[in-house]
Design a protein with these regions (language model features):
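Bacterial N-terminal signal peptides
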Residues: 18-34
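Active-site neighborhoods and metal-handling regions in enzymes and metal-associated proteins
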Residues: 7, 35-520
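Bacterial N-terminal signal peptides that target proteins for export
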Residues: 4-23
Length: 520
């Protein structure tokens, strides 16, 4: 079988991701030196608009958006508006988005069940069994914008579930596309009447250059089996030499980067639930408990409140046990401890959590801490205040027109001025959030209203106490909305929380468990 990377229309995606990987690796070296490369001189503010939509209004409206009383008609309108924006952004040709029924690691990070299906879910609202073996065809044309859902389910039920008027059995997809690839000039009037959709697609495509945007895999794990849709795409390309396949991510990523009020309301709810889980988990972080117990408390709260995990919850007590002198533990890899392994919390440390609930497939991403003895030591307090000051200052600068690199360089400079801690700050200032915890977005563009972002930085001296904050922020037309600010982070609030009892005390006994024996 021909490698995926060599397929026409797919090689550009591979090259683009390869370039991203090069930029990421280069960025680590740049960031360790304290600088993030500035965007090209051609970048300007405000950026060009690809569709007419008031994202500033949506960002303002999200705070009052009622997620608990949404009727089917309102949800249909939300997804119809998304499809309209995508149709408006298609520069020519058509778009075909298949549902995806397999999970893959998110860019070599972690397992998220719906990751590769999020584009289909974003446009239809369908997930799980409702989305099984389905495809969505979007065709902008002067006469009519075609939106057709092909489904393996009952067409009448799917029409009611999505509000999409044109719903066909999945078996009709291959027939429609086969007919549409015929030169439109060969069509007779009776054929046009018989196949209105293929006729419209054939006319829109023309004769010499037929563009079809398709959802290639976002993950490119070449060692894994190819998804079936790639073989279908390849058969279509062989059927017509004029057909050019392009990656739908080129259109969908900019649309998904700017959120509507429903998106932002879901992110807000995810942050709220995450805060509840963090408070309960960190209240229980006492000497003798295990990191796994803290993880499970937070995860239980998320699920009890109607959410799932945006990514695997990470709990870690610092300082870490000393490593052999020759061993370097890369930041970002030290947190993943198997839940079957009992890592006991010891007196005198600080428990750090990196966690996020996902509500209706929109993820939060928060980092917080608690002193396990109920009070920070003088050194812990000093490091905590440094990181907290940096976090507040960086977030205060968020507004439309600001670049990611400006926020990153500000954090690096402040960490450097505080005592050279920029040397150990080995990742960027943050990332977009949305349906993915590390969502799609363009980091060279200035910030715009409707973006949702996680801001993270911290003080991580080798062998010392790790203090790292992460907060979720929405960009508004007037500045920003710091939606995770109510999750305890002020020193006095955190110490007070550390001395409180968790509502889960009864599961672990009235008193903290005794410490595990010292290991070899």
């Amino acid at each position: 079988m021909q490698p995926v990377a060599n397929k026409p229309g797919h090689s550009s995606r591979v090259l683009r991701l390869t370039a991203k990987a090069f930029v990421l690796l280069s960025g680590l070296s740049i960031m360790s030196a304290g600088l993030w490369a500035q965007p090209p001189a051609s970048a300007s503010w405000p950026p060009p608009r690809h569709f007419d939509y008031n994202y500033a209004h949506e960002a303002r409206r999200a705070a009052e958006f009622d997620l608990d009383h949404l009727d089917a008609g309102t949800l249909h309108d939300i997804f119809a508006e998304r499809r309209r924006r995508v149709l408006q952004a298609i520069p020519g040709g058509a778009m075909l988005i298949f549902s995806v029924e397999r999970a893959q690691p998110r860019r070599l990070e972690f397992q998220v069940p719906n990751s590769e299906n999020h584009d289909f879910m974003y446009l239809t609202g369908l997930e799980g069994l409702d989305s099984y073996d389905s495809a969505l065809l979007l065709l902008p044309s002067a006469e009519k914008n075609w939106i057709v859902l092909y489904t393996s389910g009952d067409p009448a039920e799917m029409k009611q579930a999505t509000g999409i008027e044109e719903v066909k059995p999945l078996a009709k997809l291959e027939e429609d596309l086969s007919v549409a690839l015929t030169d439109y000039r060969d069509w007779r009037i009776t054929q046009i009447r018989r196949w209105p959709l293929p006729a419209a697609l054939a006319k829109a495509w023309g004769r010499d250059h037929k563009v079809l945007y398709v959802n290639y895999p976002r993950f490119l794990r070449l060692g894994m089996p190819e998804p079936p849709r790639l073989e279908f795409f390849e058969r279509m390309r062989r059927f017509s030499s004029e057909l050019e396949m392009r990656d739908s991510a080129d259109i969908l990523d900019p649309v998904r980067m700017l959120h509507d009020a429903y998106d932002l309301a879901c992110i807000r709810r995810a942050v709220q639930i995450t805060g509840e889980g963090i408070v309960e988990g960190l209240r229980a972080a006492k000497p003798g408990r295990t990191e796994t117990q803290i993880m499970e408390i937070m995860d239980f709260v998320y699920r009890y409140r109607g959410a799932t995990l945006g990514f695997p919850t990470e709990v870690q007590e610092t300082p870490l046990p000393p490593a052999p002198p020759a061993k370097e533990i890369p930041e970002g890899f030290i947190d993943f401890v198997p839940r079957s392994q009992a890592v006991f919390i010891r007196p005198g440390g600080v428990v750090h959590v990196d966690t996020g609930a996902s509500f209706r497939d929109h993820s939060a991403d928060i980092q917080r801490h608690v002193p396990v003895d109920g009070q920070f030591t003088d050194e812990q307090r000093r490091l905590y205040e440094i990181a907290l000051n940096v976090q507040k200052t960086v977030i205060s600068r968020i507004k439309p027109g600001v670049y990611w690199w400006e926020l990153h360089n500000l954090a690096v400079q402040m960490l450097r001025d505080a005592g050279g801690y920029d040397k150990y700050y080995t990742y960027g200032i943050g990332h977009f959030i949305g349906m993915e915890v590390h969502d799609e977005g363009d980091y060279e563009q200035p910030l715009q209203p409707g973006m949702a972002m996680a801001i993270e930085q911290g003080v991580m001296p080798p062998g010392g106490t790790r203090i790292a904050f992460e907060d979720d922020v929405i960009v508004t037309d007037t500045g920003h909305d710091w939606i995770s600010q109510n999750i305890p982070m002020e020193l006095s609030d955190v110490e007070h929380m550390a001395r409180e009892k968790s509502r889960f005390e009864s599961f672990a006994g009235k008193e903290p468990l005794s410490l595990a024996p010292e290991g070899p």
